[in-house]
């Protein structure tokens, strides 16, 4: 599907579905295309640890050799969830996910125990970025009189 040496390069628009090191899986035209980021994106984004996140809409140029791609453009984000980077990159932003339609938190009543602190943090982050959020409570058959107040409050 890549272009021949005497033809124009093939460009596709897609969505990043996973990120592993310097490789990104981009879903475009019904298939997943392993793609790399161009070096200029890393140099232009010193304030973030990762210039591309899962959920980003991107344009890729297919390579002629092995049907992989090079990410040539990152489209504007509708929203994102991020946190401060840890370790030596403290002060930088680490983007967790981009272009989120909705956030669902699935929490068990027990095993593992319901975690209201995590839920609070998630709901606050969603509200800050105007992302609709919801809660799914799993393992309700394990709810007892002791666990009910912790979950229901």
Language-model regions: role of each:
Residues 90-153:
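Conserved C-terminal guanine-recognition region of P-loop GTPase G domains, centered on the G4
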Residues 1-116:
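N-terminal accessory targeting/assembly segments
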